[in-house]
């Protein structure tokens, strides 16, 4: 199985010289990092030349604050959450505020992507019994734009609408890019890391207007009861044995 996986990786790197191929061993999970300008072209090649006839899922990812931790687990801490530790990660800010982009010591983890928003697609080849993950990063964090794959796999239509609704990723060429999960008039994109857990507005009954009205959130304060922790113990040491092989051509 490992030989078949590596042989397939060689075929991918030969056919798509600008992509970065990563393999998680021993599971053999393959991920292709594709330049955003080649997103559609690579996906069409995977469908037509490698028989990935089905796209089973597509989603967005927000890497803001990725790799940040609020609590050091390597030693004894004098600041437990019962003592009101002041965290830096997401979930501790109100509307209009932003989480820290660095770690507690002011550095960036080595594997933090430079771009913030990514689109991931999961592909299946029934003919060859293969699965593949394909990822690309939007080049503009302020307005993330990625080409739509509706011409490649028409079934991706609602997946892209979901990613647009929840993350604000714009899929260029999509013919019906509307919200699909949030309510009419919803403000913001709720799966973004800078979207407050308290929300933007709350509802109450207005005695004068005799109806329910939307008002800015004032009754709820941001509160995190579980710390954001990056663990490094025996359990994760075993998982580290499943090393990732990366190859860039």
UniProtKB/Swiss-Prot annotation:
GO terms for molecular function: NADH dehydrogenase (ubiquinone) activity; NADH:ubiquinone reductase (non-electrogenic) activity; quinone binding. It comes from the Bacteria. It is found in: Cell inner membrane. Its EC number is 7.1.1.-. Its main location: membrane. NDH-1 is composed of 14 different subunits. Subunits NuoB, C, D, E, F, and G constitute the peripheral sector of the complex. Belongs to the complex I 30 kDa subunit family. This is NADH-quinone oxidoreductase subunit C. The keyword Lyase does not apply. It comes from Xylella fastidiosa (strain M12). Keywords: Cell inner membrane, Cell membrane, Membrane, NAD, Quinone, Translocase, Transport, Ubiquinone. The keyword Secreted does not apply. It is an enzyme of class 7 (translocase). It is a peripheral membrane protein. NDH-1 shuttles electrons from NADH, via FMN and iron-sulfur (Fe-S) centers, to quinones in the respiratory chain. The immediate electron acceptor for the enzyme in this species is believed to be ubiquinone. Couples the redox reaction to proton translocation (for every two electrons transferred, four hydrogen ions are translocated across the cytoplasmic membrane), and thus conserves the redox energy in a proton gradient. Disulfide bonds: none annotated. It catalyses: a quinone + NADH + 5 H(+)(in) = a quinol + NAD(+) + 4 H(+)(out). One of its GO terms (cellular component) is plasma membrane.
């Amino acid at each position: 199985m490992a030989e078949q996986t590596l042989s397939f990786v060689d075929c991918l790197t030969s056919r798509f010289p600008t992509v970065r191929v990563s393999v998680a061993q021993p599971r053999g999970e393959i991920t292709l990092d594709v330049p955003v300008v080649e997103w559609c072209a690579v996906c069409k090649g995977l469908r037509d030349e490698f028989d990935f006839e089905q796209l089973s899922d597509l989603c967005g990812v927000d890497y803001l604050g990725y790799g940040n931790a609020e609590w050091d687990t390597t030693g004894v801490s004098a600041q437990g959450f019962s003592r009101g530790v002041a965290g830096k990660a997401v979930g501790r800010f109100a509307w209009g505020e932003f989480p820290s982009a660095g770690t507690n010591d002011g550095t960036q983890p080595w594997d933090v992507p430079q771009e913030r928003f990514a689109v991931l697609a999961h592909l299946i080849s029934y003919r060859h019994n293969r699965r593949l993950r394909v990822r690309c990063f939007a080049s503009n964090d302020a307005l993330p734009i990625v080409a739509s794959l509706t011409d490649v796999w028409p079934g991706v239509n609602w997946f892209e609408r979901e990613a647009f609704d929840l993350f604000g990723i714009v899929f260029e060429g999509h013919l019906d890019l509307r919200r699909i999960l949030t309510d009419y008039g919803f403000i913001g994109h709720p799966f973004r890391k800078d979207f407050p857990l308290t929300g933007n507005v709350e509802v109450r009954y207005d005695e004068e207007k005799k109806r329910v009205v939307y008002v800015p959130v004032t009754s709820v304060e941001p509160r995190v009861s579980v710390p954001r922790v990056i663990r490094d113990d025996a359990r994760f040491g075993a998982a580290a044995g499943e090393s990732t092989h990366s190859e860039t051509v």
